[in-house]
C-alpha cells in the first residue's frame, strides 16, 4: 500500500499518497499513484469547498455515489482501490472531461494483470441481454469507422469481459485493422482510451493473430510514417509471430526510432517470458553482434534490454563495459536510472517545486513527494514503460501544464547536456498544450535533433494554427531526417491544408510527397 505524507487541516489529517517502492523495483504502487491523482484533482480544484473532504463526499453522494469521508480518505491515500464508477463520478463532480482520471486506470489495468478489474473498467454482466446488444452496437460502430475513442474503450471492456465471444474472422480482421491504423493518430485522452481498448482486445486469444497480422501489414508499407505506436502493441501479444517481429525490429531497424522501440519491446517481452529458448538465443546473438559492432553505443542503447537479460549475459556485458571504462551501464542496470540518483532527485525536485507554485490553488498540505517521484521517473528512468506511465499520470493531473512550463524554461538553458535536454523535450511532448505553442515553435531549429524532434511532434498534437502551420511548412528541408519527418507529422496531424499541395508538387522531394500521400490516406489527429 502507498505510504502517505500527512498534515493537519481543518481539524482532520489530510493524507497525500506516495509510492515508496524503490526506483528500480519491477512493480509500482498503482493504488498510491491513483490515490494521488484523485486527491490532487480535488485539492487543486477551482471550487475551494471541495478541499473539505466532507463537502466533496456529499457532492459525490448527490451525484449518485454514496461516499463517507473515511472512504474518501482511504481512496486518496491508496489504502484501498477505488471502483471505476467512483472515479467516473469524481470526474463529473469536478467537471473534468470524461475519462480524464478513469482512462488512466483503464490504461494501466489493461497492461498490469494484478490490477483489479473493478479499478480498470465498469461492472459488466456478460450474461445479460443488454451486454450482448451493446456489444453488437459497438462492433458495428467500429467496423463502420464511426466509433469514437470512448466507444473503442467500451468495446475493449466488453471483449475482455467475454473473452470467449465468437466473432467471424472477417470481423476480427476489421477490428484489428481499424485499431492499428487509427491508434497512431490519437493524442492525449483519445490515446489512452484507444490504447486501453487495444490492450484489452489483445487479451482475447482469438484476436491475437489478427492483431499481429494487422501490425505486420501496417509496418510493411514502405511509406509508413508512424510506427512506434501500433508496433508497441506487440509486447501484449504472446505469439511466435509477434516475437519474430520484435526481434526483426532490433536486428534490422529502418531508423533509430524504430530501433529504440524494438529494444523496449524486446525488454518487455523478455520480462513477460514471451520468448522461447530459440528466440532467447536469437536475441542473445543480436545483442552480441550490436555490442561487437559498437560497444560504446550498445552500452547506451541497450541498457534497458541488458537489465532484463539472464544474469550470465547481463553480468558479462556489464563487466566488459566496466573494464573498458564505461561504468554507466553497470549503474543504470543496478539502479534503474540513466543518471546519478542525487542529480535525478535534485532536478526532479526543482521542477516539481516550481510547477506546484504555478498551479493557482494552494491547498494547505505540507508536502507532496509523489509529483517529484513521477517527474523523476518520466525523465530519467531506465525502462521506457515506466517513464511513459509516469508521463501519462502527470498529464492527467492538475500539474501537467505547469510542469511543461518549467521544462521549457529549463530546456532553454543551453548549459544542460544534449541528453538531458532530449529527455526534457520528450516529456514536454506529453504535457504541452495550446499555451505552449509559441515556445515549441522557438525550438524548431534547435541544434540537437533529439531535442527538436519531440517538440515538433508536440506541435502536431495541437489544433491547426495558421502561424505554426506556415512556420513549419517554411522550415521543411529537402533531406529526410527524424526532425524533417516530425515536421510532416506536425503538418498532417494538425490537418494542414498544405499537405495536399506537397503531395501534388513536382518540386517537393520524393520523401515529402510519399509522406504526404501516406498521411492523406490516414487522416489528421484523433482527439475524441
Regions found by a protein language model. Name each.
Residues 169-184, 206-218, 239-251, 272-290, ...:
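Amphipathic alpha-helical scaffolding segments comprising HEAT/armadillo-like alpha-solenoid repeats
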Residues 79, 83-101:
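DNA major-groove recognition helix of helix-turn-helix/homeodomain DNA-binding modules
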Residues 109-212, 225-231, 242, 463-464, ...:
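Short juxta-domain linker segments that transition from a proline/glycine-rich
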Residues 153-167, 189-206, 227-237, 259-274, ...:
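Structural detector for internal amphipathic alpha-helices that build alpha-solenoid repeat scaffolds
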Residues 187-188, 219-223, 251-258, 290-295, ...:
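Short inter-helical turns and helix N-cap capping residues of alpha-solenoid HEAT/ARM repeat scaffolds
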Amino acid at each position: 500500500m502507498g505510504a502517505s505524507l500527512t498534515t493537519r487541516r481543518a481539524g482532520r489529517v489530510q493524507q497525500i499518497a506516495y509510492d515508496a517502492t524503490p526506483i528500480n523495483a519491477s512493480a509500482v504502487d498503482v493504488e498510491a499513484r491513483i490515490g494521488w491523482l484523485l486527491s490532487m484533482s480535488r485539492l487543486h480544484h477551482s471550487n475551494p469547498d471541495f478541499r473539505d473532504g466532507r463537502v466533496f463526499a456529499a457532492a459525490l453522494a448527490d451525484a449518485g455515489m454514496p461516499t463517507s469521508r473515511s472512504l474518501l480518505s482511504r481512496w486518496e491515500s491508496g489504502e484501498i482501490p477505488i471502483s471505476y464508477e467512483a472515479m467516473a463520478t469524481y470526474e463529473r463532480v469536478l467537471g473534468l472531461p470524461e475519462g480524464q482520471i478513469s482512462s488512466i486506470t483503464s490504461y494501466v489495468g489493461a497492461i498490469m494483470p494484478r490490477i483489479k478489474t473493478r479499478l480498470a473498467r465498469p461492472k459488466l454482466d456478460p450474461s445479460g441481454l443488454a451486454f450482448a446488444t451493446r456489444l453488437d452496437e459497438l462492433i458495428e460502430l467500429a467496423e463502420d469507422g464511426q466509433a469514437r475513442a470512448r466507444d473503442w474503450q467500451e468495446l475493449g471492456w466488453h471483449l475482455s469481459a467475454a473473452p470467449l465471444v465468437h466473432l467471424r474472422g472477417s470481423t476480427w480482421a476489421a477490428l484489428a485493422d481499424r485499431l492499428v491504423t487509427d491508434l497512431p493518430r490519437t493524442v492525449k485522452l483519445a490515446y489512452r482510451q484507444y490504447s486501453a481498448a487495444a490492450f484489452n482486445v489483445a487479451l482475447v486469444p482469438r484476436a491475437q493473430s489478427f492483431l499481429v497480422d494487422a501490425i505486420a501489414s501496417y509496418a510493411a508499407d514502405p511509406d509508413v510514417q508512424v510506427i512506434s505506436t501500433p508496433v508497441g502493441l506487440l509486447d501484449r501479444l504472446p505469439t511466435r509471430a509477434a516475437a519474430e517481429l520484435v526481434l526483426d525490429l532490433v536486428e534490422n531497424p529502418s531508423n533509430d526510432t524504430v530501433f529504440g522501440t524494438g529494444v523496449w519491446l524486446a525488454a518487455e517481452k523478455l520480462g513477460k517470458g514471451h520468448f522461447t529458448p530459440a528466440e532467447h538465443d536469437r536475441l542473445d546473438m543480436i545483442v552480441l553482434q550490436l555490442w561487437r559492432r559498437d560497444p560504446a553505443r550498445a552500452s547506451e542503447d541497450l541498457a534497458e534490454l541488458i537489465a532484463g537479460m539472464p544474469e550470465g549475459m547481463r553480468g558479462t556485458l556489464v563487466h566488459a563495459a566496466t573494464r573498458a571504462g564505461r561504468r554507466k551501464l553497470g549503474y543504470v542496470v543496478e539502479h534503474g536510472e540513466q543518471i546519478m540518483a542525487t542529480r535525478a532527485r535534485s532536478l526532479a525536485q526543482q521542477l516539481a517545486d516550481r510547477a506546484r507554485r504555478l498551479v493557482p490553488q494552494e491547498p494547505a498540505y505540507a508536502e507532496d513527494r509523489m509529483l517529484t517521484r513521477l517527474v523523476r521517473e518520466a525523465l530519467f528512468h531506465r525502462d521506457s514503460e515506466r517513464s511513459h506511465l509516469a508521463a501519462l499520470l502527470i498529464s492527467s493531473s492538475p500539474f501537467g501544464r505547469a510542469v511543461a512550463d518549467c521544462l521549457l524554461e529549463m530546456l532553454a538553458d543551453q548549459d544542460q547536456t544534449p541528453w538531458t535536454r532530449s529527455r526534457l523535450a520528450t516529456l514536454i511532448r506529453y504535457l504541452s498544450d495550446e499555451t505552449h505553442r509559441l515556445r515549441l515553435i522557438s525550438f524548431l531549429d534547435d541544434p540537437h535533433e533529439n531535442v527538436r524532434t519531440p517538440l515538433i511532434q508536440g506541435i502536431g498534437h495541437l489544433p491547426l494554427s495558421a502561424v505554426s502551420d506556415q512556420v513549419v511548412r517554411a522550415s521543411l528541408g529537402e533531406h529526410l531526417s527524424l526532425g524533417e519527418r516530425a515536421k510532416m507529422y506536425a503538418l498532417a496531424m494538425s490537418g494542414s491544408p498544405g499537405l495536399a499541395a506537397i503531395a501534388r508538387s513536382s518540386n517537393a522531394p520524393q520523401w515529402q510527397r510519399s509522406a504526404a500521400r501516406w498521411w492523406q490516406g490516414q487522416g489528421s489527429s484523433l482527439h475524441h
